[in-house]
Curated annotation (Swiss-Prot):
<dbReference type="GO" id="GO:0050728">
    <property type="term" value="P:negative regulation of inflammatory response"/>
</dbReference>
<keyword id="KW-0325">Glycoprotein</keyword>
<dbReference type="InterPro" id="IPR020423">
    <property type="entry name" value="IL-10_CS"/>
</dbReference>
<comment type="function">
    <text>Major immune regulatory cytokine that acts on many cells of the immune system where it has profound anti-inflammatory functions, limiting excessive tissue disruption caused by inflammation. Mechanistically, IL10 binds to its heterotetrameric receptor comprising IL10RA and IL10RB leading to JAK1 and STAT2-mediated phosphorylation of STAT3. In turn, STAT3 translocates to the nucleus where it drives expression of anti-inflammatory mediators.</text>
</comment>
<feature type="disulfide bond">
    <location>
        <begin position="30"/>
        <end position="126"/>
    </location>
</feature>
<dbReference type="Pfam" id="PF00726">
    <property type="entry name" value="IL10"/>
</dbReference>
<feature type="disulfide bond">
    <location>
        <begin position="80"/>
        <end position="132"/>
    </location>
</feature>
<keyword id="KW-0964">Secreted</keyword>
<feature type="signal peptide">
    <location>
        <begin position="1"/>
        <end position="18"/>
    </location>
</feature>
<dbReference type="GO" id="GO:0002904">
    <property type="term" value="P:positive regulation of B cell apoptotic process"/>
</dbReference>
<dbReference type="InterPro" id="IPR009079">
    <property type="entry name" value="4_helix_cytokine-like_core"/>
</dbReference>
<dbReference type="GO" id="GO:0051045">
    <property type="term" value="P:negative regulation of membrane protein ectodomain proteolysis"/>
</dbReference>
<protein>
    <recommendedName>
        <fullName>Interleukin-10</fullName>
    </recommendedName>
</protein>
<dbReference type="GO" id="GO:0051384">
    <property type="term" value="P:response to glucocorticoid"/>
</dbReference>
<dbReference type="GO" id="GO:0001819">
    <property type="term" value="P:positive regulation of cytokine production"/>
</dbReference>
<dbReference type="GO" id="GO:0002237">
    <property type="term" value="P:response to molecule of bacterial origin"/>
</dbReference>
<dbReference type="InterPro" id="IPR020443">
    <property type="entry name" value="IL-10/19/20/24/26"/>
</dbReference>
Length: 178
């Protein structure tokens, strides 16, 4: 097991373990979540930094996949659904394809995906951060544009992963302040 994956697992286990007499694991995990969020975002950014240059060098397109409308959805009433759908999109569509583009980056993309899965798990445990059902038009537009780009879509989506992390941060900051 690689050190970043091991560290991620340790952070998750530490945040989930409840102290005796202090409520459920979920409750304790949720009270610590706002404090752990900066570390989780840093882990995502660190993992992305290992593949960023590769994908940005391969991304020859001038258009933007993750547009401002997606950030607006993250900040609006569809924020929960937009975040949930985008995490699912990256985990199920983008990253599996990205892993197959070069054996040298497969491990790093996998590590990035594991960090994103850990974030999703923590968000799901804390229902106030992900209590949603509606569909986001901005996410639908991202997915349609990604599909139209075919193989180049992977480069585009992965090269913009840092924008996605910033949008996650904006959403979570807004939710923590409310």
């Amino acid at each position: 097991m690689h050190s970043s994956a091991l560290l991620c697992c340790l952070v998750l286990l530490t945040g989930v373990r409840a102290s005796p007499g202090q409520g459920t694991q979920s409750e304790n995990s949720c009270t610590r979540f706002p404090g752990n969020l900066p570390h989780m975002l840093r882990d995502l950014r660190d993992a992305f930094s290992r593949v960023k240059t590769f994908f940005q060098m391969k991304d020859q397109l001038d258009n933007i996949l993750l547009k401002e409308s997606l950030l607006e959805d993250f900040k609006g009433y569809l924020g929960c659904q937009a975040l949930s759908e985008m995490i699912q999109f990256y985990l199920e569509e983008v990253m599996p394809q990205a892993e197959n583009h070069d054996p040298d980056i497969k491990e790093h993309v996998n590590s990035l995906g594991e960090n994103l899965k850990t974030l999703r798990l923590r968000l799901r445990r804390c229902h106030r951060f992900l209590p949603c059902e509606n569909k986001s038009k901005a996410v639908e537009q991202v997915m349609n544009a990604f599909s139209k780009l075919q193989e180049k879509g992977v480069y585009k989506a992965m090269s913009e992963f840092d924008i996605f992390i910033n949008y996650i941060e904006a959403y979570m900051t807004m939710k923590i302040q409310n």
